[in-house]
Amino acid sequence: MNTVRVTFLLVFVLPVSLGQADKDENRMEMQEKTEQGKSYLDFAENLLLQKLEELEAKLLEEDSEESRNSRQKRCIGEGVPCDENDPRCCSGLVCLKPTLHGIWYKSYYCYKK
């Protein structure tokens, strides 16, 4: 009977206890790798953030250049009624009282200067 017990201990208990030790070692190795991976991810994240900030700065610079050179928007064209107090006529146009054909409307229109 003793040989059966010894055999049982050798065959079943010893591998289980060694397997648990390996499991603990594997767990420690995984923790080390994840810590290394986190530091690598932090580095990669910072690098990506720097690149995105540079790209954003370039895009904002281009937008400001476009806004300086772009044409006037939301203005009233020629022959369109306008408000005498708040004229929004496009550049090159003036808000004037109509002559002849538009007198009966009692309104101001955008005309060329």
UniProtKB/Swiss-Prot annotation:
It is found in: Secreted. GO terms for molecular function: sodium channel inhibitor activity; toxin activity. Residues 60-83 are annotated as: Disordered. InterPro entries: Toxin_22 (IPR012627). Residues 1-21 form the signal peptide. Disulfide bonds join 75-90, 82-95, 89-110. Pfam families: Toxin_22. Its main location: secreted. Keywords: Disulfide bond, Ion channel impairing toxin, Knottin, Secreted, Signal, Toxin. One of its GO terms (cellular component) is extracellular region. Coiled coil: none annotated. Expressed by the venom gland. Residues 60-69 have a biased composition (Basic and acidic residues). Residues 22-74 form a propeptide. The presence of a 'disulfide through disulfide knot' structurally defines this protein as a knottin. Probable ion channel inhibitor. Belongs to the neurotoxin 14 (magi-1) family. 01 (HNTX-16) subfamily. This is U11-theraphotoxin-Hhn1a. It comes from Cyriopagopus hainanus (Chinese bird spider).
